[in-house]
């Protein structure tokens, strides 16, 4: 019996359409043929029901289902117990819970759809854990008995008896536009229970947007408002779901400092974050989540920050002797980096001249530069310094006479914009067929781009129903599939989880090398930027007023230039070479600043 309990059947209610198929799963099931009701499809039911007790794990129904709605998953043996919550029969289930500790920041790291948001809801007291018994959910007394002897018991006793107040920053800040009416300043005044509104507005640079309404501000401003709205509340548990999306590097670190300032000896702070360098800087300890997205998730025991992130990247949990990913993820700096600028001159292929562009009150000056084939140039700068404007200038989006002082060469350009909120009614298959039919038929493109980005699973879904991360993967595929000289990609990491970011980086890098093209990329995730960059363009100046885009320079000198303005130093982790931010005023931080080496390549 123990063998059978470690198998779960997942039926996706979105994909399963019993009225549109011949119920192939039921007809082909060998257990049903023996007369047992392993798979049932009622005349009124919206999806099939699979009995996990009767299922023998043959996997025939998985192959036969025309909508790919079924997953049969064999779990590790020790997952027969410790179920915290399950969303109904054949639904997602979560094993164990992260363990928050008062006075410390708990970081959660894991892929999308693995149960991080479910864990947050349970810890916030918004969702009562059913311990896997969705038909007869237990009461709080039974739940506390289940967790007895662990740190979670004392935590849940406080949640139930003391009515702990929770303040949550949601994952998708775009929804604030639909909910909040009136200007942001008045909204923040209403929420201010700690009298800290002026302080947080100065810290998060919100003073200039307080008179505006939610629908008039950018994603980054909305994110900073959402963090401020949680900060001014008087609460016992503070939760932040992806606080760094839409923010630039400087704002991410400021947000991290603001979140850490919420710590009291009796308060809990929990953060879900996909930018690993920010998570590293922010957290005191980390819980990893692994499993199969949309099917089941397992929470590990707490690790120290460095060890936890390294465990996640290695894909192996030493405490449980369990491998949850086939390969480990490491960060070697770009193999094609040209260190000295003289080397580029010898085979420079393209040049662009000095340019200026006036857009309303904003003026951008671009210093002349050059680039070669098979090269990725990453643009580093704060929000509002004209990175997207420069991309559009190269793409020829502005008329020639409108302030460009000298001719820009004619480049055939493929452009992926920053936002990708597509409202198209067609399926992903139709969209790819319309836009990049030739590329999709090419086996090299299939193996280099479509399979690693897992686009095949999305083919029959309607574009407007996709999640943010799924839309982002489709947008990257569309951009790379279009034949062009230059690929301009604006924030490829937005909405992607840590694992998908690394996959997307590898896909872009491999494609650019194979196709012998050039890519200009805007990226705020530091780990992804350093992995991608062959050369960097640094932007400096006053955002939204006047900025300068410097000529492309080597990764080391460009990063040093950029980080010296931000007053941050990085070191490299000896295990997997990922960049780690030094704590401000630490010995390592002072040493590197004295030596003038803000960024390390040689560890």
Curated annotation (Swiss-Prot):
Pfam short name (any one): ABC_tran
Signal sequence extent: none
GO molecular function, one term: ATP hydrolysis activity
Residue ranges of every copy of the 4Fe-4S ferredoxin-type domain listed in the record: 7-39, 46-75
Location(s), subcellular: Membrane
InterPro entries hit by this protein: 4Fe4S_Fe-S-bd (IPR017896), 4Fe4S_Fe_S_CS (IPR017900), AAA+_ATPase (IPR003593), ABC_transporter-like_ATP-bd (IPR003439), ABC_transporter-like_CS (IPR017871), P-loop_NTPase (IPR027417), RLI1 (IPR013283), RLI_dom_1 (IPR034348)
Expressed in which tissues: Expressed in roots, stems, leaves, flowers and siliques.
Domain of life per record: Eukaryota
Record's keyword terms, sorted: 4Fe-4S, ATP-binding, Iron, Iron-sulfur, Membrane, Metal-binding, Nucleotide-binding, Repeat, Transport
Binding site for ATP: 110-117, 381-388
GO cellular component terms, A-Z: membrane
Gene3D superfamilies attached to this UniProt entry: P-loop containing nucleotide triphosphate hydrolases
CDD domains (UniProt xref): ABC_RNaseL_inhibitor_domain1
Matches recorded under PANTHER family: ATP-BINDING TRANSPORT PROTEIN-RELATED
Similarity-based family: Belongs to the ABC transporter superfamily. ABCE family.
Name of the protein in question: ABC transporter E family member 1
Chain's gene name: ABCE1
């Amino acid at each position: 019996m123990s063998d059978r309990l470690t198998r779960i059947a997942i039926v996706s209610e979105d994909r399963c359409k019993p009225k549109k198929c011949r119920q192939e799963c039921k007809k082909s099931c060998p257990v049903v043929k023996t007369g047992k009701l392993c798979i049932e499809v009622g005349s009124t039911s919206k999806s099939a029901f699979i009995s996990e007790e009767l299922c023998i794990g043959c996997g025939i129904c998985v192959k036969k289902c025309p909508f790919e709605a079924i997953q049969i998953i064999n779990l590790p043996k020790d997952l027969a117990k410790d179920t915290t919550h399950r969303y109904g029969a054949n639904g997602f289930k979560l094993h164990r819970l992260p363990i928050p500790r008062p006075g410390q920041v708990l970081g959660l790291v894991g892929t999308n759809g693995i149960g991080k948001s479910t864990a947050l809801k349970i810890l916030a007291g918004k969702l009562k854990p059913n311990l896997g018994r969705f038909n007869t959910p237990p009461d709080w007394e039974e739940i506390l008995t289940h967790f007895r002897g662990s740190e979670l018991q004392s935590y849940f006793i406080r949640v139930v008896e003391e009515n702990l107040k929770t303040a949550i920053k949601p994952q998708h800040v775009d929804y604030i536009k639909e909910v909040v009416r009136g200007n942001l300043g008045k909204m923040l005044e209403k929420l201010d229970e700690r009298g800290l509104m002026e302080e947080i507005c100065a810290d998060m640079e919100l003073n200039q947007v307080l008179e505006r309404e939610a629908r008039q501000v950018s994603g980054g401003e909305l994110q900073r408002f959402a963090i401020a709205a949680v900060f001014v509340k008087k609460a016992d548990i503070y939760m932040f779901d992806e606080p760094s999306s839409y923010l630039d590097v400087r704002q991410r670190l400021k947000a991290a400092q603001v979140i850490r300032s919420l710590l009291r000896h009796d308060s809990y702070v929990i953060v879900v974050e996909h930018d690993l360098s920010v998570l590293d800087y922010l957290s005191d300890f980390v819980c990893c989540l692994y499993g199969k997205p949309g099917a089941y998730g397992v929470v590990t025991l707490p690790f120290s920050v460095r060890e936890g992130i390294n465990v996640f990247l290695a894909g192996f949990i030493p405490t449980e002797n369990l491998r949850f990913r086939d390969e480990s993820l490491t960060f070697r700096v770009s193999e094609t980096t040209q260190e000295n600028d003289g080397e580029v001159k010898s085979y420079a292929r393209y040049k662009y001249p000095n340019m200026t562009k006036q857009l309303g009150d904003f003026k951008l000056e671009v210093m002349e530069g050059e680039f070669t084939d098979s090269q990725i140039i990453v643009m580093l700068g704060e929000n509002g310094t004209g990175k997207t404007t420069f991309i559009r200038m190269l793409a020829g989006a502005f008329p020639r006479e409108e302030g460009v002082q000298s001719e820009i060469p004619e480049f055939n350009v493929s452009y992926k914009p920053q936002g990708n909120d597509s409202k198209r009614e067609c399926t992903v298959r139709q969209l790819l067929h319309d836009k990049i039919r030739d590329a999709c038929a090419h086996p090299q493109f299939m193996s280099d781009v479509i399979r690693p980005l897992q686009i095949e699973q999305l083919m029959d879904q309607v574009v407007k129903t996709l999640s943010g991360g799924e839309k982002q993967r489709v947008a990257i595929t569309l951009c790379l599939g279009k034949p062009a000289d230059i690929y301009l990609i604006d924030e490829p990491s937005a909405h992607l989880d840590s694992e998908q970011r690394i996959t997307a980086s590898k896909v872009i890098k491999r494609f650019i090398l194979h196709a012998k093209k050039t890519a200009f990329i805007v990226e705020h995730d530091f780990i992804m930027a350093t992995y991608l960059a062959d050369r960097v363009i640094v932007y400096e100046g006053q955002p939204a007023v006047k900025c300068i885009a410097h000529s492309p320079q080597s990764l080391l000198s460009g990063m040093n230039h950029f980080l010296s303005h931000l007053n941050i130093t990085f070191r490299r982790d000896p295990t997997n070479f990922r960049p780690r931010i030094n704590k401000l005023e630490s010995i390592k931080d002072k040493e590197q600043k004295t030596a003038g080496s803000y960024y390390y390549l040689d560890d």
